[in-house]
């Protein structure tokens, strides 16, 4: 359901941007330079909200429709097609680490636009007489289009689009991954073992997401926050006990009480996330990363103490829900693997492979 809602939001955004681009094209005064139509900005926006590949195909279709409707010359169509290829290549290499990177990309696209449009006019000058004023006007329009509209203006309206559609862009996600964010800073200071675990898991999730075509930025950022619920009782989680210099406090607890403390951290994390106004898509990682898995250690301890006839396995499971997105499913696997490998004493590569396969 969550995945369908996200896909629906992305399609809604794409359709609305397409309508806006169509209106701009229709309202353009006769005789005005076609190079001012913000097709590069459209391609960048769709790339940010979906993928560069999807954006390239969507913008190519839109370009063809506009070109036919406005009776563009072939050189204008070729210019925009070449420019779209540059945009797709530039955005696909973007790491989305900070919003200002968009200005760097738009600068490169502006230079490419100048070279493409200028190169086509240079070739045409050998075949026909072209007014130099027209050339300079079109070159100016392509620079305004690629840098001012696709860079400066886009940078300003992205946060508005994020709030309006309640969907996270890679830039918004990258900002959440900043270790100076309050919850991450608290995790680093109050539960350093959990913070290091989250950092390791986030890298695993990012690599796995890239490998299967999921959203690597979302997977990495969601993994950074998945265990924030441990902030309420950090000493009850083994990775933090050496930092606090204490013995395992679970030795003084019954298996049922320990299970209650352990399985509470997703729910505790949601409360912290709501207080911090984290987006719902990040909350999904917090709530779903254990699914309905069994807390096997304390279940087995309860079997020893109480006997099998007095212990219900369902009472020792996380309440769920199970992951319902690729990225949260990746986190569930990565979290379990990292914890199991960390618990093993100096495992060999073969032993690590066996843990992963198990």
Each language-model region and where it sits:
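Hydrophobic transmembrane alpha-helices
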Residues: 63-71, 105-130
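Single conserved hydrophobic/aromatic residue that forms the stacking wall/gate
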Residues: 1-8, 13
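Internal alpha-helical transmembrane segments of multi-pass membrane proteins
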Residues: 93-115, 135, 139, 143-144
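Generic transmembrane alpha-helix motif of multi-pass integral membrane proteins
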Residues: 39-55, 63-66, 86-91
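Alpha-helical membrane-embedded segments
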Residues: 113-116, 137-163
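Divalent metal-dependent catalytic cores for phosphoryl transfer on phosphate-bearing substrates
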Residues: 182-346
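Membrane-proximal helical linkers
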Residues: 129-135, 139, 162-196
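Interfacial aromatic-anchored transmembrane helix boundaries in multi-pass membrane proteins
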Residues: 31, 63-90
